[in-house]
Amino acid sequence: DQGFNSWG
């Protein structure tokens, strides 16, 4: 998770 996406 990169922080802005909740699926990554």
Swiss-Prot record:
CC per GO annotation: extracellular region
Regions that span the bilayer: none
Modified residues (Glycine amide): 8
Subcellular location(s) per record: Secreted
Keyword Zinc: no
Swiss-Prot/TrEMBL GO biological process terms: neuropeptide signaling pathway
Keywords of the record: Amidation, Neuropeptide, Secreted
Function: This cephalomyotropic peptide stimulates contractile activity of cockroach protodeum (hindgut).
Protein name: Leucokinin-3
Species in which this protein is naturally found: Rhyparobia maderae
High-level lineage: Eukaryota, Metazoa, Ecdysozoa, Arthropoda, Hexapoda
